Amino acid sequence: MVEVGGGAAEAAAGRRWRLADERCDLRAAETEYVRRFHRHEPRDHQCSSAVAKHIKAPVHLVWSLVRRFDQPQLFKPFVSRCEMKGNIEIGSVREVNVKSGLPATRSTERLELLDDNEHILSVRFVGGDHRLKNYSSILTVHPEVIDGRPGTLVIESFVVDVPEGNTKDETCYFVEALLKCNLKSLAEVSERLVVKDQTEPLDR
């Protein structure tokens, strides 16, 4: 886990947040992505953090899954059902049902930003029976090369209220664990699709 500073002003104000990854070092490009796209301003009663995942699949494939605001169950293992009316556009609201075993059953979520050029997805929780109040996330998708092949770096950051009775660290660790599961599943689904595409006959 790496501590990432949010700039001199934020450091002076005592605001620090982490970027959690399987690796303990960040390349300059990754740090630049965080600085450029993942700008949160947590208040005293909030915490903010991020997770990253390197996926052995091209950006266009990974983004095609991520951008489906209407079908988060494509790669999110804790989602059992999702309903959304209308087209996928900024302001769209989805009703998500959560699988049993988690301290929640449903979540109402609004699409804040969907940028197909920069590959940015931002979502805010606006209701539900969970404890993630004022939760807002930013997910970005970036091209990279892994083992000489097209790959993808996915970074997801968030800010959320710290529930009464919990610490900032406890809240961050809980949310980070959920996001890591989501990104691990995203990697598995994406990489399976790559293998499938490579093994399908050319005359299909």
Curated annotation (Swiss-Prot):
Gene Ontology BP annotations: abscisic acid-activated signaling pathway; response to cold; response to water deprivation; seed germination
Motif Latch loop, chain ranges: 130-132
Domain of life of the organism encoding this protein: Eukaryota
Site (Involved in ABA binding): P77, V175
Motif (Gate loop) on chain: 100-104
Keyword Repressor applies: no
Disulfide links within the chain: C47-C172
Induction of synthesis: Repressed by abscisic acid (ABA).
Residues binding abscisate, per UniProt: 76, 104-109, 131-137, 156
Site (Involved in interactions with PP2Cs): P103, T167
A matching Pfam family: Polyketide_cyc2
Matches recorded under InterPro entries: Plant_def-hormone_signal (IPR050279), Polyketide_cyclase/dehydratase (IPR019587), START-like_dom_sf (IPR023393)
Subcellular location(s) of the protein: Cytoplasm, Cytosol; Nucleus
Summary of the function given for this chain in its UniProt record: Involved in abscisic acid (ABA) signaling during seed germination and abiotic stress response. Acts as a positive regulator of ABA-mediated inhibition of seed germination, and tolerance to drought and cold stresses. Together with PP2C50 and SAPK10, may form an ABA signaling module involved in stress response. Inhibits the protein phosphatases PP2C06 and PP2C09 when activated by abscisic acid (ABA).
Family per record: Belongs to the PYR/PYL/RCAR abscisic acid intracellular receptor family.
Oligomeric form and interacting partners: Monomer. Interacts with PP2C50. Binding to PP2C50 is dependent on the presence of abscisic acid (ABA). Interacts with PP2C30 and PP2C53.
Protein name as catalogued: Abscisic acid receptor PYL3
Species this protein is from: Oryza sativa subsp. japonica (Rice)
Biological classification of the source: Eukaryota, Viridiplantae, Streptophyta, Embryophyta, Tracheophyta
Gene: PYL3
